[in-house]
Amino acid sequence: MRFAFDSNHSQSGAPFKGSRCFFNCQCICCRQGCCVVVVKCCCCFNLNCCNSLGSRKSFPQPAAMRKKVADLEVLRVSRFVAVILVLARWVTAVATLLTSCILLDIFSVPGQSGVADRSQASSRTVHVSVPTTPNETPSSTSETKLKLLYGYTSYDINNDQQVKSNNLCRVLCKSRNRKRQRRRRRRRNHRRRRHRYTKRLHHLMQDNMSGFEQRLNFSDAKCQSLETNYGTNYDLVQGGKLFSQSERSLLVSPLREIEAPWPAIHGSMRNCSKIKRNRANLIWLLIGLVWFEVKLINCNGISSSNYYASNLESHKGCTLCHESGKPNIYTDKDNPHTDYNIYNKYHSNNNFNKKTNQPHNNIAPSDEVRLESIKRQILTKLGLSHKPNVSHPLPKQFIWETIYRVDGGRMIPNNAFGSSGKNLDQKTIKLRAFASPGSHLFNGRGGRTDQRSERDPSHHKYRSPFDFTFNISKNNVYGKVLRNRSLERIDKKNSFLNGWTENRQLKINSQIASMPIELKSHHNSSPKELKSGAVRKVNGINGTQMNENALKKSTYPIDINHSIDNKTHTGKNGEMSHNDYEYFNDYSVQTHDKNRYHEGRSSIGYQPAIHNIEYENQKGHHESFADDHENIDHEDFFGNTQEIITFAEEGTQYRQYRILEFSAQNRRVPSQKLSIRSAQIHIRIDKPHSLWIEKAKSLPEKHLLNTKRKWGANKPHHRIKIWVFQLSTSINITEKGIDKAIIFRASFQVDPKNLGWQKFDLTDTIREWYGHTSHEKLRLLIDCTGCGGRYSLHLFQTSKLRGNSSDYLSTNPNRPFLVLHTESSRTRRVRRRAVDCGGALNGQCCKESFYVSFKALGWDDWIIAPRGYFANYCRGDCTGSFRTPDTFQTFHAHFIEEYRKMGLMNGMRPCCAPIKFSSMSLIYYGDDGIIKRDLPKMVVDECGCP
């Protein structure tokens, strides 16, 4: 090969026989018979100008064309080639970036639920470390730095979404100081790379120039043929390209020399390096934007929907919902059914018939069917066609206060309530912790202070938060003054009682003689025995003594203030007091029916006539046996009411008295006969804020002690007595015969020293009221003798709401209410041991726990308690090898199973079904009050095969 530097210089010898230029180029300098390389020729140094696929035909051009090739054209072509290379690199980088983003977006969505479910099924706690950059390898030093930076803590997570959010927060949310350090470090690295690149380029240019000068020394030598150097066979390489080592070096090195002087090359290289360095950060940024957009949509969907979602699962799957400060759907501690049921299904020891993992914020279709069935079952058992209208219900706090008062100060948790009863008991105790030591304490014993509670400091005393009784600071001194009565007053009272007329005395004796003998003997008991807090006994039907503890069958402990508990009902020898007789004369009560009169009078001693009670019991006993077969189905299906709380309604006005009206509750459930075990009315009695109490507060203690005799002589002994009358609904109170419509029911003595909520027994009145077939309201007239201006009854006085400046008037929350305790005649069966799926064999018929939350069902607005219950269901197989003969309930089932194993009854298979149920207690808002009802067969206790 020969180098020619002059365009006119050419090969002098004859061309090589049968051969042409190896490049098959159309250039004149290359078509002279052998390879003559011209340095300034573009076609000899640029591969793109050579037509390697062209034909071997020669197109000779005149020699003058070589002179027209200028240096400017060479520079333009080289710059054009450099621009094409830079654009190709940019296009490649952009295509790679878009492809990676699309692939990550496609593969991140389907794998999200699977990864989350696998992470939850495998383990609950995963220790996560901060991820390093793509170019950084994990090491002990980097882990130590990260631990020092973020603390020695581990994050407990249950799905992969939390890991992504934590990684993105650490990658994208850096502090300003770290960003500044990163920018400074990046600038230093850029300067160092630029300096190294310029030095390396300078060395390369020097090496190329030295090699080029060495090749110029052989310019006069002739070019040897390719056959002699390499032994080329043209039969094998026709139309192909063969490169020698010298040709490659000659083709590449001058191109670099030409491209190097172009100043734009350095800028393009720097831009490409920046793209490569920032490619990882840009990819993470795009992934974060796509991921955050999806999660924001999911958060909005969860927070705006009314579907069955749980607080725990929304916290796991949606981090931004809690970081943004928006309120969640469920914020209490109750456990919605989705959380417990999903955890119970996929974390039990039994691996039989497990379903595929479902998203945590949704409910499986099978669970939705169960929930709808449970809702229909509850409404049907309550005798309702739809959810009750609770647009304006009573406040739940007021309801719990009422239940607490009914309980008598101690809340007994029901097993059906679970943990909610315990929490409720603690909350109610805390609510009453603010009662001051000097305030009047109410212990649910009809205005008395239990001596057991005085001796035992552990006995819980409480005061209702609605009790705003005015408290005198010097109550001890004032109490001593009022209690110190002279003996002369007692003698005067006895002489006054003995001075009655003979007619009145005979009339009173005849009235008392008409009462049972046991009741008279009870009235003759000493006052010390009644005041000592001993066990008070009431004579039963057959002469046997019945204790007050016989009422312990109630859900709550009952201690009623019976009228026989007070000595003040009788005179000196057991006869009626003078004030009582005058009270009857004032009302002009006329009773033409003797039996009816005695029945009403006997309620004073809480002892009805013996023959009437025996007749009612025999009649009820006979009717219970007659209707036993008919009531079996109703008792097993409909709810069994145990307790009813009915608030008084404001009736008409009669003189200065307000009539109380109560609605019956026995019409809610079809074919259900309520049997009243006991009934009490709760009435609140307080002291008003009168002027003489204010003056008594300001009097010094010495002045009160000096004027003790004067107070005792002028101030009479105040006694409070409550009278209860029933008004007949068939007669209008505006008629002249109003006295005939009033029936006396009972009277009760109240101790003025212990005021507040009082409980009075009205069992006979309520039994007679519920015994009527018609659904008439109970109308009661309540009066107080001895109250005057000192004490007041809370009936229907309106008062402004506390803490509200508006003039809105609401009904007094201290209005009276009735508490009815019903009894159930259903027999209890012995409970057998149930097999849970947690400890059952593989495929065995077992009981699966299934929790139902009323809040998740949207029923927390009308169901007061409980917050939820375990409905449970059965699953498993009854045809496994574990089925032994003793597991069959009947011989017929065993016989059918043997035939099925023989192949004679292939179409029949036994099913795993519930065989034992239990009831659930429910307290809810009724149309007329608060009702507690036991719903039978609501909880699956045992599963088995037939």
From Swiss-Prot:
One of its GO terms (cellular component) is extracellular space. Residues 115-142, 174-194, 436-462 are annotated as: Disordered. It comes from the Eukaryota. One of its GO terms (molecular function) is growth factor activity. Disruption phenotype: Development of larvae with small brains and aberrant photoreceptor axon targeting. Disulfide bonds join C837-C846, C845-C912, C874-C943, C878-C945. Pfam families: TGF_beta. The record marks N585, D586 as: Cleavage. One of its GO terms (biological process) is regulation of imaginal disc-derived wing size. Residues 128-142 have a biased composition (Low complexity). Keywords: Cleavage on pair of basic residues, Developmental protein, Disulfide bond, Glycoprotein, Growth factor, Secreted, Signal. Residues 447-459 have a biased composition (Basic and acidic residues). Controls several aspects of neuronal morphogenesis; essential for optic lobe development, EcR-B1 expression in larval brains, mushroom body remodeling, dorsal neuron morphogenesis and motoneuron axon guidance. Ligands Actbeta and daw act redundantly through the Activin receptor Babo and its transcriptional mediator Smad2 (Smox), to regulate neuroblast numbers and proliferation rates in the developing larval brain. Homodimer or heterodimer; disulfide-linked. Belongs to the TGF-beta family. This is Inhibin beta chain. It comes from Drosophila melanogaster.
